[in-house]
Amino acid sequence: MKKLLILFACLPLLGACTQTEPVSGNRAAAIVAEIHNPRSKNVVVASHRGDWRNYPENSIAAIESVIGMGVDIMELDLKLTKDSVLVLCHDRTIDRTTSGKGRVCDITYDSIRRCVLKTGHGVKTTHRMPTLREALEVCKDRIVVNVDQGYEYYDLVLAV
């Protein structure tokens, strides 16, 4: 009888032993499964442009930071350079977010890459504007990516 009572007392603890990530370690797939689970009681957290309070928005460092925080979805913005490279940038120009000036669509990727990103307060950093490919390599299997500004580049995004 005593063993039976201990067994029933321990049953609720088994419910806490659920696996949140697949055995493969693909956290992004687990998040997508969670989103599609109508019985889920979990809150899914999304980050707009990454950890832009501590790093330049849409930068690799901002993405790495939110992954480290356990954020589930990274929302990013895309623009296309003059030489057809998809880069992470919210604005039509690079004026606010980098040390450079001009419209993204009028500048080559090589020229943009020479600029440094700025913080939200306009302070220059050592960070550079990443390409979509670079960002996706960082995010792969670790966080779900939501492309916010990028529908006009749909086919190019799929190619990456």
Region locations from a protein language model:
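Bacterial Sec-dependent N-terminal signal peptides
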Residues: 1-27
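Phosphate-group recognition and catalysis centered on beta-loop-alpha active-site segments
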Residues: 17-160
